[in-house]
Amino acid sequence: MKVLIVGSGGREHAIAWKVAQSKKVDKIYCAPGNAGISEVAECVPIGAMEFDKLVAFAKEKEIDLTVIGMDDPLVGGIVDVFEKEGLRVFGPRKNAAILEGSKAFSKDLMKKYNIPTAAYETFTDPEKALEYLETAKMPIVLKADGLALGKGVLICQTLEEAKEGVKTLMMDKKFGSAGDEIVIEEFMTGREVSVLSFVDGNIVKIMSSAQDHKRAKDGDQGLNTGGMGNFSPSPFYTKEVDEFCKKYIYQATVDAMKAEGRPFKGVIFFGLMLTPYGPKVLEYNARFGDPEAQVVLPRLENDIVDVFEACIDGTLDQVDLKFDNDRATVCVILASDGYPVEYKKGFPIEGLEKFKGKDDYYVFHSGTKFNENGQIVTNGGRVLGVTATGKDLKEARKKAYEATEWISFENKYMRHDIGKAIEEA
C-alpha cells in the first residue's frame, strides 16, 4: 500500500521510520518532509496547510492511507477534507481536534465530566482578566486558548508578571488570534508526565509514558520551547498512577468526547501533572508529541499501520498493543543556538553517517534540508533528535549523550541535563 505522511518535523520522521518497517507498505510519501525523512520516504514540496493540493496529490498517487502528524492541519479540519473526498486518513476530525485547538474547550469539558484538572477561569476581555488577577494567588498560569507552537503558556511568579502576560497574549497578540481568549489557572506542583494513547472513537489504548523537558536551558531555566529532550518510560509513572488515570482520566476523556458528539479517532497525548493530591490533566494534544514520538515509537512492537487502520475502523479492541518494556529510550534535541527566539540556519551538518548500522542509536531530523550542493544543512530551531535505547534509562541516557558528540554544526546547542531526574527516581 501507499502511505502519505503530512508534516516536516522529528515526529514525522519517527512516524515515517516506523511506517517503513510495515510489511504492508511499499511506498511512502511525506509532505513537505525534511532531509532525514527523505531516507525512508519521497518528500514532496506541499505545505501541511495546503489541503487542496494534498488531496489532489493523494488522488493522483492513489494513496491508501494518509497520516497527519501536525496539530495545525488537524485543528484546521484536514481530516474532514480528506474524508469528504473518500480518502482514508488517520487523525481526529475538526470537531474532535478542538480538544487541543481550544484550551477553554478542553478545560470546560474536564469540568463538565469531572476529569481531574487545575482550577481555572476563562477570559475574552483583557480588563476582566486583569481584574481577576488582583485577587488571585501567585504563582499563576496563563494559557493562550489557541495553538501557539507549544509556547503559549506563561508561568507567572508575581502579579506584575501576570499582568504583563495578559498584555502579551491578549493586547499585543503575540500569538495572534490564539490569544483572543485565555485560560488563567492555578499553578500546580509535582512532576510532569506525558502519556500517548491510540483512540478509535470508543476505546483508548495507552502506548507509554514519557517525560519532556520544555525549557530551553539547563536546570529548567529559560523560555518554553517545543521540547528539548525526552525519556520513556517515566519512572514516576507508577502502577498506582496508571490505575488512577485509567479509572478517572483516559477512558473518561474518550467517553466525554463521544457524549459531546465529537468522537475522537487518532492519538491523544495526555499531559499530566502528578500532584500531591493525585494526577491531574495539564493539557491534551490531538497527535503524537514531538519529541515524545521519538522515544515511544522505537519501543512499539506492533505494525503501526495495523494500529492506524484499527483506529480508523473502530476495531482497536482487537489490537494487542505491545511495547518493549525491557528497554528505555532517551532523546536529546540538538538545536540552533538562540532557539526559541532568534537563530541562524543553513549550516552544514557533519557526522550523520555515524548512526548508520548501529543498533540502539537513531537520529530523527526536525529542522534540516538539502542545500543546492546536496549537503544536509540546518533549517530550524530544533535541528535533530539524537536518540538511544538501553536496558534502562541510565544506559539509554549515557548512549544518547555519547551520540550527540558524533554530530557537529556551527551553532549546535543542547541541554546537558535531559533525564537527570532519572537519578532521583
Task: Give the label of every model feature segment.
Residues 1-94:
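ATP-binding N-terminal substructure of ATP-dependent carboxylate-amine bond-forming enzymes
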Residues 43-49, 121-125, 156:
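Short acidic-hydrophobic, aromatic-tinged amphipathic segments that line or gate anion-handling sites
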Residues 92-152:
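A conserved helix-loop-beta module that forms one wall/lid of the active-site cleft
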Residues 230-233, 331-333, 382-390:
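Short, well-ordered beta-strand elements within core beta-sheets of diverse protein domains
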Residues 246-268, 285-358, 371:
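Active-site "cap" helix and flanking loop/linker of ATP-utilizing ligase/carboxylase catalytic domains
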Residues 368-373, 377-425:
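Generic C-terminus detector
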